[in-house]
Amino acid sequence: MVGLTPQHYGNAIALMTYLASTALADNKFPDCTSGPLSKLAVCDTSRDVTTRAQSLVDAMSFAEKVNNTQYEAPGVPRLGLPAYNWWSEALHGVAGAPGVHFADSGPFSYATSFAQPILLGASFDDELVKQVATVVGTEGRAFGNAGRAGLDYWTPNINPFRDPRWGRGQETPGEDPLHVSRYVYHLVDGLQGGIGPARPQIAATCKHFAAYDMEDWNGVSRHEFDARVSTQDLAEFYLPSFKSCVRDAQVDAVMCSYNALNGVPTCADPYLLQTLLREHWDWDQPGHWVVSDCGAIDDIYIGHNYTKTGAEAAAVALNAGTDLDCGTVFPKHLGEAAEQGLYTNQTLDRALVRLYSSLVKLGYFDPAEKQPYGSIGWKDVDTPAAEQLAHKAAVEGIVLLKNDQTLPLKAKGTLALIGPYANATKQMQGNYQGPPKYIRTLEWAATQHGYQVQYSPGTAINNSSTAGFAAALAAAKDADVVLYAGGIDNTIESETLDRTTITWPGNQLSLISELSNLHKPLIVIQFGGGQVDDTPLLTNPHVNALLWAGYPSQEGGAAIFDILTGKAAPAGRLPITQYPAAYTAQVPMTEMGLRAGGDNPGRTYRWYDKAVVPFGFGLHYTSFEVSWDRGRLGPYNTAALVNRAPGGSHVDRALFDTFRVQVQNTGTVTSDYVALLFVKTEDAGPEPYPLKTLVGYTRVQQVKPGERRSVEIEVTLGAMARTAANGDLVLYPGKYTLQVDVGERGYPTARVSVHGKEVVLDHFPQPPEGR
């Protein structure tokens, strides 16, 4: 999402900073008791949402309407409508943004900072996602109630992680459409306080709609990039998470993206914003609105050259269904566009009614006693329960990639703590962060666990200096155990910054190699959102253990040491594919196709089979055996499956079956187990067939040694279906193989047969001619 503003445009949009202004926020609640607004229906809580919002819009002059189509809305002083800043952020906790104002100290000077979405996604724990989101939503509401933020937040980022070089992959839960879809459903449920609630806790915003996953690659910028995507890939990969967010979770807001899609900038695309979003996904209820990414409406005429003037850009965006400009094109040019007859007053009113309907639902115009979330305040921010949840979220996501029985550590002693993350603080938060009350460093955690720590960073994230190597090696020689903490950070991957390589920085690899030559127990902690090719570490016999920790945030050091010492057992799974370093030379970032063919080696685990570490991989401190609970599965009939779907619901969400497997802990350590269920076929529907597809998962908590659990994995019709070339979601007859886990473990498979005729579960709206 939201953008660092395109600097070459010269727009007067504030850049986001980590430390927000200490001044009080612009957002103050209006006076609906005695002020001018009290005479309007917007303050009458007995009226319906649309009537209330319409009364406010009707009272505005044309100039006042135009002025309030920007994120930094000035309000209408003569009506008693205060200014309102729509731009608040809360990707993994309330974060710095133009609309969020942290105090210097005391109340509202911090908020709980949870693990970045890429690490939370690695937990494959839907209930945990909802719990985290509930806390983030509660704390967001507390800031909003205090006038230190808005009541809407521009989160989550749900673009699937297509290319390993993408700088913002850390903001997403992973690469698989089903996984991202389930993640966002539970996240929005927690943020907003339910599925489509009449009175949401906050308004969430799903972004970036659509096919946005590139910042700046080889001189191609997101501000002018035209993503060429087939209808099949669009429906199968790029849109399912948005369908889940919009149609199923009923989010209140959506953000259109910087890029164009098949020739049309997304914020100017009625096919995306009207045909798909509002009509096909039935998302035109009161209080649902679309905001542009910041500067994206500028891009319509400056980056994409889709229109010649700012007035034309403003009009095409408004007509397409963009309601709010995170920028200044609307307030600067809608007046001129109106004079040219490029849009109607009704279209302008429609946008404003959508926006103010959202604020009506949020209780912005209600007296305190009628606001269901009005009592939320500072007492509800960073509570002990929230801190415990932040710890749990970090622990559950950590993935063990290699272990030769060195872990868990069995004795206290001297520990050499080396690497650019060895004493990291903010670095462990990733991007879109806010100030937390504390950040548990690795050094702090090691001391808490009784280790004598010898700290020596040795090297930076990415440079050519070896000046610190000698001190690091000296510290390692005197230690019982060596812990190297490194990887990548926001100087290598971030918004506006894609990677050009997916290797470990050379200086870090050199230091790790020299440390391994000491033949001391060597554990490497890999930080960062995107993966790096771990081949040099996986093949080095003197690198004894390797963990991926993503961006674990405020509880990072404590969570990692709980794993290292065995206080907690690792059970996270990689939510993305770890590609070999050579992959970046095989396919350009601008190639949006998923399927292998021609010069495209394929993307994601569904179409690429040469991974260094596959999607879904994760080791444990114990061992598990998995077996099928039923000897015979099915047979199934397409017509019968569809006919038994509940009336009034979307048939793709109906149950195909609930599969049961037996999971037994055959080792000696109590551990969670993530049961991933994949399906593959070689005759159901047309070729080419994906290598396999995730159709369901569940996280089994705390399985004790020797314990056997019966685990249920629900699979929907939509998960078993495939996407046709025209985008239709089709359930095909044929033979399917079910596989638990990532395949390397040799767990048994099961075969099922689906009979009958192919059935279309969802007819995908066809794009306009020529697209």
UniProtKB/Swiss-Prot annotation:
One Pfam family of this chain: Glyco_hydro_3
**What top-level branch of life does the organism fall under?**
Eukaryota
Looking up Gene3D superfamilies in the UniProt record yields:
Glycoside hydrolase family 3 C-terminal domain, Glycoside hydrolase, family 3, N-terminal domain, Immunoglobulins
Pathway(s) where this gene product acts = Glycan degradation; xylan degradation
Instruction: Return the EC number.
Output: 3.2.1.37
**PANTHER family in the record, alphabetically?**
BETA-D-XYLOSIDASE 5-RELATED (PTHR42721:SF3), SUGAR HYDROLASE-RELATED (PTHR42721)
Similarity section: Belongs to the glycosyl hydrolase 3 family.
- Protein known as: Probable exo-1,4-beta-xylosidase bxlB
Q: What is the lineage of its organism?
A: Eukaryota, Fungi, Dikarya, Ascomycota, Pezizomycotina
